[in-house]
Amino acid sequence: MNPVVLTIIISSLGLGTMMTFIGSHWLLVWMGLEINTLAIIPLMIRQHHPRAVEATTKYFLTQATASALLLFASITNAWSLGEWSLLEMLNPTSATLVTIALALKIGLAPMHFWLPEVLQGLDLITGLILATWQKLAPFAILLQLHPMLNSNLLLFLGVSSTVIGGWGGLNQTQLRKILAYSSIAHLGWMITILHYSPNLTQLNLALYIIMTLTTFLLFKLFNSTKINSIAISTIKSPLLSIIALITLLSLGGLPPLSGFMPKWLILQELTKQDLAIPATIMALAALLSLFFYLRLCYSTTLTMSPNSIYLSSSWRTKSLQPNLILMMATSLSILLLPLTPTIFMLTL
């Protein structure tokens, strides 16, 4: 892609997100979301492949529907209250419509149908942007509106997302679909705790972005899009395969890695709010997600792809070296658990 065009696209992504962050008027916030959506479409379709075209079309139609619903909700709220301010969402119907629209935008269950198919049709770098940066603007709105949103609706969206995210990834062999269902499950944890502790939502979102960034970069270095294609990662780079193992376990939420921290704090907060049953369901759903993370770990570090003795030795391939961004993201993905007491005090 032309560097000038790429610079304009990346700048537009940043501009749209910043407009949503700083905007207090509903039309300004809506414009920021639309700029975000339109800016990523050229990145999605740059491959000129039928799968990329299909994924881009699905993404555009879904985001257009969510944007129309969001605009309708804001107009309804302004009509009933005479106020366009973002923080004056006092109409219960409008607040519910905003929640549904933003859930559709980020891919929460049961509005998740588009995310696995869209992510499967993209390359890994564009998929990384879709799975991380594109979540920031909708979550900025949700964090500002959390006192006015229906807690029961948020709880339903969160619990169903954790269950469907874990269940949907069990039978997948495509890495991008597995990461899509992983994203759905993590978003479920964030939405569940949003009404009770928005600080925990921000913590979970930050750790999710760091761990997802590490995972996508590793798969990009391995040049892998299927489970069976990462079996030779140990041959390409033993160090990177070990990093991938630890990062995937952190995504699964195993102690003593960083990914355990938000799950621990969220389950603790839900129990304090007398929500033991949803907390139990989410803890059990996390085991479903852990199962397909362990499948990836097994394929990455404990298996090798079939290799004929008549072929040249596969260990003579060019060695892969981790870059600075990957090493920093990996460190944050696996080493933050000792900070839990301090973070717990900050989230009170």
Swiss-Prot record:
The keyword Metal-binding does not apply. The chain crosses the membrane at residues 3-23, 25-45, 67-87, 95-115, 118-138, 149-171, 178-198, 203-223, 240-260, 274-294, 324-344. Keywords: Electron transport, Membrane, Mitochondrion, Mitochondrion inner membrane, NAD, Respiratory chain, Translocase, Transmembrane, Transmembrane helix, Transport, Ubiquinone. The keyword Disulfide bond does not apply. Its EC number is 7.1.1.2. One of its GO terms (molecular function) is NADH dehydrogenase (ubiquinone) activity. It is found in: Mitochondrion inner membrane. It catalyses: a ubiquinone + NADH + 5 H(+)(in) = a ubiquinol + NAD(+) + 4 H(+)(out). It comes from the Eukaryota. GO terms for biological process: mitochondrial electron transport, NADH to ubiquinone. One of its GO terms (cellular component) is mitochondrial inner membrane. It is an enzyme of class 7 (translocase). It holds the Pfam family Proton_antipo_M. It is a multi-pass membrane protein. Belongs to the complex I subunit 2 family. Core subunit of the mitochondrial membrane respiratory chain NADH dehydrogenase (Complex I) that is believed to belong to the minimal assembly required for catalysis. Complex I functions in the transfer of electrons from NADH to the respiratory chain. The immediate electron acceptor for the enzyme is believed to be ubiquinone. This is NADH-ubiquinone oxidoreductase chain 2. It comes from Squalus acanthias.
